Amino acid sequence: MLMITSFANPRVAQAFVDYMATQGVILTIQQHNQSDVWLADESQAERVRAELARFLENPADPRYLAASWQAGHTGSGLHYRRYPFFAALRERAGPVTWVVMIACVVVFIAMQILGDQEVMLWLAWPFDPTLKFEFWRYFTHALMHFSLMHILFNLLWWWYLGGAVEKRLGSGKLIVITLISALLSGYVQQKFSGPWFGGLSGVVYALMGYVWLRGERDPQSGIYLQRGLIIFALIWIVAGWFDLFGMSMANGAHIAGLAVGLAMAFVDSLNARKRK
């Protein structure tokens, strides 16, 4: 028996089990603190993990509900959460994902109250040689956002991609990707535009590159990003580079972040293949 994953919401677990049953794969649920999903036939593990990655992208897809009807489990007596939106948020996000989201929101509120400049004096990339040993500055620039749309866009992608990485590969992997991409994307961006920039987008682009390439080269990792979304990311970089939308974008951070994510995914997938 091989444990595939755990769900906080037992109804979500049952939906996945029902769907896999329609695909000819038998999974079982064991209730502990969470709903643990187990696979008896370990030879099917790769297929199940690939399907799990797709399921986590959109658990509300009609095909999963249809599978529950087909399996006869829609009236299973499981407890439905009162707030499915927040249950979905918790389902995908681990502690590191939440900590970064909360930190970004707190910094954003502080910027609205104190003003952008006041907060940037404390968190921006070192803008004076005397600040080069204030090491937090090499990372905290990623926590600053300058509009509601800016922070919503970045946090949505952070939750979607960072949560998947943390759930499947662990908090440590997400921390490493975040710190390395924040450092290197910040370094490149300050070479382009100076120290007065901010936002999580460099890290988000690193996660896009990492999740896409790792999923392509190592499907057993359980993470996956549709090719259409990585194409969208590339189009957005080109649009920002040529200023097609008249918006100020951290183009250097975007390119550097994407490169960092791709490089880390290549190395990790190479190591995964060597272990087989």
UniProtKB/Swiss-Prot annotation:
Keywords: Cell inner membrane, Cell membrane, Hydrolase, Membrane, Protease, Serine protease, Transmembrane, Transmembrane helix. GO terms for molecular function: serine-type endopeptidase activity. Its main location: membrane. Its EC number is 3.4.21.105. One of its GO terms (cellular component) is plasma membrane. GO terms for biological process: proteolysis. It catalyses: Cleaves type-1 transmembrane domains using a catalytic dyad composed of serine and histidine that are contributed by different transmembrane domains. The keyword Transmembrane helix applies. Rhomboid-type serine protease that catalyzes intramembrane proteolysis. Belongs to the peptidase S54 family. This is Rhomboid protease GlpG.
